[in-house]
Amino acid sequence: MLDRRSLLLGSLLLASSFAYADAAESGGMVTPMPTPDGGIQPQAAVDARGVVHLIYYKGDPKAGDLFYARMAPGESRFSAPLPVNSQPGSAIAMGTIRGGQIAIGADDRVHVAWNGSDKAEPKGPGGNPMLTTHLNAAGTAFEPQRNLITWAGGLDGGGTLAANHTGDVYVVWHANPDRDGEENRAVYLAHSADNGRTFGRERRINSVPTGVCGCCALRAFVDRAGDLFVFYRAATAKISRDMYLLASSDRGATFRSEKVHPWNINACPMSSSSLTQTDTAVQAAWETQEQVYFADFRPDGGRRTGPIAAPSGGSGARKHPVVVANGKGQTLLAWTEGTGWSRGGALAWQVYGPDGKAVTALRGRQPGVPVWGLLTAFAHPDGGFTLLY
């Protein structure tokens, strides 16, 4: 069996395969790219210096590994990958919505959180752990993974994390310690005030008893003003699977709750969502009834514009939306089509102008999303977008 050092040394040989063309050089505003190294479920974040940080998944969908690579401004290649999880096989890709999440904290420290697989250690109360780690100060390796669940166990759908430049790191998951149905699930937060070195005990943050869709993922985000947002799908009475946005202006001490979009369905859609920063607002993207939408929100969580639906056309149910804005006020909305349990599909996208209207010429679709695949995207200084699948 290869140890972690062998994996790292071997990964150096793969660096030459991580080439990426600049969006402006690719002949189009949106450049679709497969995840490097044959990985799936890419997740990207861009730091204050313009460095793109990427994590992705490889291995057995039930018990695999996360890897990390970065690309500096002006470069066209991602670095050789580093292993993220310290215990091999402790991540999970099956179901699509339980994989790794990435955030950039103080001093551009990279933080990662993920739902632990059945093999993952240390275990938490109620089973699978909610795991986290961060890149060391030298940027050469990740610290040993830690479980943050101390009492709110019963993990199911994907957890998430967010961070800011002042040292706050927020890891969020939904759980049901009493195991009495998803209509009684709640959202829990573990907060670090020292850039991920230590975390406080988790506490419930949604005061409205909405329940939480058991096998749906959460998404957290900190805007440039330091406000914290958490986007989740409810499961009220097992039927009302509406999207809710929680917003906090006091570093997660208190939250306001805003119902964003209704959806009555007596089933779990296994959905994910997206949050991003624009020049003037926070944008959210989500799925409702096999369609994807996005909207702008104020710091208090109230909606400013939208929801705006993706244009008609395509083939298959639309899922797993991603939204990202560039410096010109344009928005890229991307999503998968035809994906499902143990089934890949296509990726599709639409660029919207600063007025919120779809630019017909900046629309696309192509096959290639692998089984258990997700999308991620980032904007370039020239306004172009790279869309990873």
Predicted feature residues:
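Short alpha-helical segments used as structural interaction elements across diverse proteins
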Residues: 1-2, 230
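N-terminal export leaders
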Residues: 3-8
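Hydrophobic h-region of N-terminal signal peptides that target proteins for export
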Residues: 12-21
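Extracellular, repeat-based ectodomains that mediate carbohydrate processing or recognition
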Residues: 21-389
